[in-house]
Amino acid sequence: MKQKVIYSAPDEFGHFGTFGGKFIPETLVKNAADLEEEYLKAKNDPEFHQTLDNLLRHYVGRPTPLYHASRLSEKQGGAQIWLKREDLCHTGAHKINNALGQVLLAKRMGKKRIIAETGAGQHGVATATVCALFGLDCIVYMGEEDIRRQAPNVARMKLLGTEVRPVTAGSRTLKDATSEAIRDWMNNPEETFYIVGSVIGMHPYPMMVRDFQSVIGRETRQQVLDQAGRLPDVIVACVGGGSNAIGMFYEFLPDAKEVELIGVEAAGEGLEGKHAASLTKGEIGVLHGSMMKLLQDEYGQVQEAHSISAGLDYPGVGPEHCYLQKLGLVCYTSTTDKEALAALDALAKTEGIICALESAHAVHYAMKRAAEMPKESIIVVNLSGRGDKDMGTIMQELKL
């Protein structure tokens, strides 16, 4: 039995080592303080947890299965690949775990107007869904480029009664949508609650989103012990902002000496070309209220990120991932657009599961590693979402 890792972060100021924190304008200081205070109360309130657990079970469909992909494993000829099926959550991805938690907080705080940012549209759909469920006004900011790539999700949000506001600034993707949402929050601090979709932004968001997503890892730990009789050798998740990955990794951090934790970023067209691999190629900087590793030019200007998957197309990454990389508890690598497409194709043809392009980045790494490992080894992949939203891109790229 290897020694357990003792891990505790963030500190009371929201720092994960040198990362994280609250780099915010004065207009948001009270909002941030109120949010943190209310969250810490909710965190210790059994009634809050009971309400959330009930919704996760009866509305979202948790626990999601841990599925042994035996044909995919056989194809690779090595380790056994298991899939944590977050694609089976209501709305098609892990994002709803967090949206539900935050909307319950908004209700506790008496907020009536909800805003959110979205890249792939999955967080937008999840937020629109929970706002419809609770009868709250909802505005989602989305980059024009992402609106083009993710038309079905835009239609879903509108059908759910949400106003989708196109963002035409900058790269017209997730970074710009986030900036616009923060601007809205600064202009309407009293009545508005901002539901952040990933483990990014100022404290307490990275901690809060992690806590709401950690249900993924809690379930997986129990399921793999029940089904395989032991902990896995490797756990893999894709990393954009990083919420599905931190949700999976957090419960396994004490076991990091015996379980290898791997985060897979988007290498896009290649690490020397256009990509979104902030942990691999980024430098330390501040974006959206938090210190993190960022893609930036020689003058410190934030660069545009590129990935075939809209959900990984962010030039930064959650501060906790930066800290875990620095501590050596998680190892980060990257997968190109082409490799992700090939993995998506292979999973569809061997297991009958069409996953999201984001998740396909993790699947590719798992397939590659499985081929190099003995048959009795276990790799768990967080299959963070389903591929319905990506069919336009998939049809185009795979010439279907």
Curated annotation (Swiss-Prot):
Co-factor(s): pyridoxal 5'-phosphate
Entry EC number(s): 4.2.1.20
Keyword Amino-acid biosynthesis in record: yes
A Gene Ontology molecular function term of the record: tryptophan synthase activity
Enzymatic reactions: (1S,2R)-1-C-(indol-3-yl)glycerol 3-phosphate + L-serine = D-glyceraldehyde 3-phosphate + L-tryptophan + H2O
Residues bearing the modification N6-(pyridoxal phosphate)lysine: K95
Pathway where it operates: Amino-acid biosynthesis; L-tryptophan biosynthesis; L-tryptophan from chorismate: step 5/5
Gene3D superfamilies the record matches: 3.40.50.1100
GO (cellular component) term, any one: cytoplasm
One Pfam family per UniProt: PALP
Coiled coil, from the record: none
InterPro entries: Trp_synth_b_CS, Trp_synth_beta, Trp_synth_beta/beta-like, TrpB-like_PALP, TrpB-like_PALP_sf
UniProt key word Transport: no
Alphabetical keyword list: Amino-acid biosynthesis, Aromatic amino acid biosynthesis, Lyase, Pyridoxal phosphate, Tryptophan biosynthesis
UniProt similarity note: Belongs to the TrpB family.
Task performed by this protein: The beta subunit is responsible for the synthesis of L-tryptophan from indole and L-serine.
Assembly with partners or alone: Tetramer of two alpha and two beta chains.
Name under which the protein is recorded: Tryptophan synthase beta chain
Gene: trpB-1
